[in-house]
Amino acid sequence: MGPLMLDVLGYELNAEEREIIQHPTVGGIIFFARNYHDRAQLRALTKDIRKTAAKPLLIAVDQEGGRVQRFREEFTQLPPARAFEQHNNGIELAKKGGWLMAAELLAMDIDLSLAPVLDLGFDCKAIGDRAFSDDPKKIIKYASQFIKGMKQAGMATTGKHFPGHGGVIADSHLETPFDSRENIKEHDMIVFKYLIENNLLDAMMPAHVVFDAYDDKPASGSDYWLKQVLRQDLHFKGVIFSDDLNMKGADVMGSYSERAIAAQQAGCDMVMLCNNREGAIQALDGLPQVNVPILDTLLKRPTGEYQELIKTSMWKETEKEISRLSLEWREKHS
């Protein structure tokens, strides 16, 4: 599988996208809200992508819940991660939420929801209620259950944003944040460390944040954070994704091809470049044509179709509980 994940523009593939998807460097497609009209359209799109690619290809989406849920109509409305902490039955509900999110996507032939968020909430604009808590010990508790639910459904898990995005107010979608704390390894990073030690993470996504007490590069392009800390010190054996290299937080890494190459050389197995077709093509031309076998470990196993899933008692009961939690959260925070 190739090392580049990119996006498509709409509900259907256009001629240029059909050609791009067949390029040997392309190993993944990530969906956004603009790619979704209804389940029938989405299913047709995933089928077309797999047929066109004629090779193993990861199909991913950000379907965390709350404000980061790309597919809404005809899917369960998922609560943000923070909702679990604020419910007295939140531990059990977190596992059910992880299962439901994953099961619905797998039934649509989507391999991955890039989840869960393992950052501390703090006041970070990019994170906020996407975090389970502001307390790392509580994040470990809730995230572990959410992950177990995802794995029960059959989906690989992606922890983000290593070693922790929550300590900066700036949004890395809009600018390059700097975090000067020296204690991040003893604070934010303990969440990632625990989950790695307990074999709960299949993939990792680093932050577009410069931790300047340690290195002058964003973690997503830093061999210090990816090779030394994540691989050597924490013994992480899974896949490393870059976050979207079109984000402003990656601007300090150079041109689009330079960003992709820098992220790959720093230790990313798959680099992501979205919402910029010209930039994606630059990355496509700049990256070496290599096969990355570890990416195959994230492909979904065969599952039933969505119509079969929603007939099961487990889906019906879980959907009712998670929908209720989501509604309660929205009413409380509207």
From Swiss-Prot:
User: Which GO biological process entries does UniProt record here?
Assistant: carbohydrate metabolic process; cell division; cell wall organization; peptidoglycan biosynthetic process; peptidoglycan turnover; regulation of cell shape
Question: Which enzyme class, named as a word?
Answer: hydrolase
Subcellular localization, as worded in the UniProt entry: Cytoplasm
InterPro entries, alphabetized = Beta_hexosaminidase_bac, Glyco_hydro_3_AS, Glyco_hydro_3_N, Glyco_hydro_3_N_sf, Glycoside_hydrolase_SF, NagZ_Beta-hexosaminidase
- Residues bound to substrate are D62, R70, R130, K160, H161
Q: Does the keyword Cytoplasm apply?
A: yes
Gene Ontology CC: cytoplasm
Q: Does the keyword Cytoplasm apply?
A: yes
Function according to Swiss-Prot or TrEMBL: Plays a role in peptidoglycan recycling by cleaving the terminal beta-1,4-linked N-acetylglucosamine (GlcNAc) from peptide-linked peptidoglycan fragments, giving rise to free GlcNAc, anhydro-N-acetylmuramic acid and anhydro-N-acetylmuramic acid-linked peptides.
Database matches in NCBIfam families: PRK05337.1
What name does the UniProt record give this protein?
Beta-hexosaminidase
Organism of provenance:
Photobacterium profundum (strain SS9)
Encoding gene, per UniProt annotation: nagZ
